[in-house]
Each structure stands twice: as C-alpha cells, then as structure tokens.
Amino acid sequence: MRGARPAAGGGRWVEISPERLRGWLDGFYGRHDGAAEDSLTLTGASNGDTATLHPPPGFDGVTDVDGLLTALIRPPRIGLLLARKGAVAAGVVDGTAVVVSKVERHYVQGRTAAGGQSQQRYARRRDNQATAAANRAADVVARVLLPYGTADAEEPIGALVCGGDRLMVDAVLADRRLAPLLPLRHPHLLDCPEPRLAVLQDAAVAARRVRIHLVP
C-alpha cells in the first residue's frame, strides 16, 4: 500500500495492490464494525467513514466490490505512455509484466537567463526542439501501441495509462495517427520521473493499484 495523500476537496487517497485488496477490505470492515456497500462505496457502521474504490484502468464494467475482486484475478491488457521533456517510454502490459516496450531519449534545451534577441533565439530553438521531441515520441507510440489500440487487434489493450508531464503527454497524443488511442486514455496521470525501462516497469505495477478515496 502506498502512503495516504490528501485529496482535493477533502479526505485522502490510498493505493492498494490487487493482491492486498481483500485483506484491506477485511480490515476496514473490522475497524468499523461492519460496513454498508453501495456500488463501490463502503460506509462504516460505527462512524459513517466512507471508502470509495476506484478500479484500475480497463475495468470500466465493474460496478461493485465483488465484481472488482473477481475482475482483478485476470486484469485486462493495458498500454503505457510516459513522457517528459527528455524522454518517452511506451509499453504494453500483461498483468504487471511489460511485454512490449520502447524507450527513447531526446534533447530539449533548458530555459536561459539571457535577454533581448538572445532570449528570443533560445526560445525559438527550444520550441523547435520540443516540437521535434513530441513528433519523435509520437513515432515511438505509434510503433508500440497502435497495433494493440483498435477493437479488431488480435490482443487489444483495454486502456491507455499515461504518466509524467501532462503537457508533454498531450503534445504526443495530438498526433493524428494516435487518434484510435484517445478513447482508451484513462484520466488518472501517473506521477513518474524521466522515463527509463525501470520507470516503465514501476509504472506497470502502479497502474494496477486500486485507488481508494477515504473520508474522513
């Protein structure tokens, strides 16, 4: 389980690995003298505390706790896209194993303290480098994920999970070739450092966790 983080609007988030979820639920029931279930929300009998379970990406049809526990036994295949200024990583994940992947680094100049024409020249160069980096990243995503991103694919992905810098991810997915992936994009953005293979493997594990919103 990852440590609790404050949630916007109140409460806190915890993330539970699939194999630990049943034990976590047993603990919640025990601490609250039982709980009422309404879809994916548990309400503690002793004090009204609530826990709302958010299934991992690709579990769109899950509507109750029992259904979630059953679905977690055989999770769907998912795609990963991690992007930051200096690198991109794309992969296909079965369970928590990355079965297809590609990582590519690129150079984008940092900001400069120079002023006047020099600053404008650096800014133009930096913008050009950022555009070129997004284009190369889109090439990587097209090669790795598009073969799995359509309904008629032999082994389609059930969701696209993104991580890193949201602006960079958006720039990559703006490529028209990647339009078939957009309906699969999951809204939650993984927090990750500059992509490497090890980071991609860590993201494959993180993407499978069940996110739980606890109030209070």
Where are these regions (language model features)?
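Terminal alpha-helical anchor/extension segments at protein ends
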Residues: 1-216
